[in-house]
Curated annotation (Swiss-Prot):
Its EC number is 2.1.1.170. Keywords: Cytoplasm, Methyltransferase, rRNA processing, S-adenosyl-L-methionine, Transferase. It is found in: Cytoplasm. It comes from Pseudomonas aeruginosa (strain UCBPP-PA14). This is Ribosomal RNA small subunit methyltransferase G. GO terms for molecular function: rRNA (guanine-N7-)-methyltransferase activity. It catalyses: guanosine(527) in 16S rRNA + S-adenosyl-L-methionine = N(7)-methylguanosine(527) in 16S rRNA + S-adenosyl-L-homocysteine.
Amino acid sequence: MSAVTQHHADELARGADELGVALDADKQRQLLAYLALLIKWNKAYNLTAVRDPDEMVSRHLLDSLSIVPYAEAGDNWLDVGSGGGMPGVPLAILFPEKRLTLLDSNGKKTRFLTQVKLELKLANLEVVHSRVEAFRPESPFDGIVSRAFSSLEDFANWTRHLGGQETRWLAMKGVHPNEELAALPEDFRVEAEHALAVPGCQGQRHLLILRCTA
């Protein structure tokens, strides 16, 4: 029996509707196919501590979709420390016209992400196996997103060479990171903060949007 059922499809559709994110049948199919791959590969590759498929829908898929309204601007995005592909893979599915680069230093995780790209035929997705400090793209990214990657200070310092004055840095956090904000480098400023309500998720969720003023 498939690990992904109609129940998960209904949960995804209902949650996306609550978030105001439009999912057509093809995007929903791709997201569920990604979920199936995540469940399958997680057994051997330990991609996420979340094992329950029900929790994966809310804590991974819907959590990723919650930032869709804030990722609409810009055509070239980087998901740094992508891990199992959140939020980069869902963003690549939702925005086929954008280029999504998924960066991770863990070879097992980038092998999984490469398989996702192949099986879901995501031509707009690029997987890079590298440490963030060593990554040197040809041009700055329009947006750089992280989810459970590092402190805000490290996120800013480690990725500043990957952006420019027009770049937005999106940091997905749980509780509001007051102490991390106090340690933010002087040349970074908070452009916006958003409290996110993710269907099926307990606890706080926050999105911080940063700019580099240097």
